[in-house]
Amino acid sequence: MSAPFEERSGVVPCATPWGQWYQTLEEVFIEVQVPPGTRAQDIQCGLQSRHVALAVGGREILKGKLFDSTIADEGTWTLEDRKMVRIVLTKTKRDAANCWTSLLESEYAADPWVQDQMQRKLTLERFQKENPGFDFSGAEISGNYTKGGPDFSNLEK
């Protein structure tokens, strides 16, 4: 089986004071830099459908209402190399038209250029899912790609 689309084509990260976040059609990834040597028991992470909270050593790093809903039971977090916490959230709405413009409702918004690149990437990922025999990992997209690109579902085959 081939590597996931984001591994072949890269991601479009949105930088934050604590790390970065990025998204695919189905998931939102949050990468938080923590002090080297951090242990799992130092981490308090709460994941709900519309809320996320992360504290390390009692210090709140991230807390708020998510931009859109996620499937709470599928959210996970891991401590990697004792210096980064990765949170993976599964989107409830999994299509290219559901490109999050920010991580939280009022914080960590992608600037217009990053938002544009995120939308392009999600549209390409949508095309890859619809056409599994083609490799879109090195493709560029232009034209009508906002809101997931054109809808070809009602065209005759």
Curated annotation (Swiss-Prot):
It comes from the Eukaryota. One of its GO terms (cellular component) is centrosome. Signal peptide: none annotated. GO terms for biological process: protein folding. The modification Phosphotyrosine is found at residue 145. InterPro entries: CS_dom (IPR007052), HSP20-like_chaperone (IPR008978), NudC_fam (IPR037898), p23_NUDCD2 (IPR037902). Its main location: nucleus. The modification N-acetylserine is found at residue 2. Pfam families: CS. GO terms for molecular function: unfolded protein binding. Residues 134-157 are annotated as: Disordered. The modification Phosphoserine is found at residue 142. It is found in: Chromosome, Centromere, Kinetochore; Cytoplasm, Cytoskeleton, Microtubule organizing center, Centrosome; Cytoplasm, Cytoskeleton, Spindle pole. Residues 14-104 form the CS domain. Keywords: Acetylation, Centromere, Chromosome, Cytoplasm, Cytoskeleton, Kinetochore, Phosphoprotein. CDD domains: p23_NUDCD2_like (cd06494). The keyword Transmembrane helix does not apply. Disulfide bonds: none annotated. May regulate the LIS1/dynein pathway by stabilizing LIS1 with Hsp90 chaperone. Interacts with LIS1. This is NudC domain-containing protein 2. It comes from Rattus norvegicus (Rat).
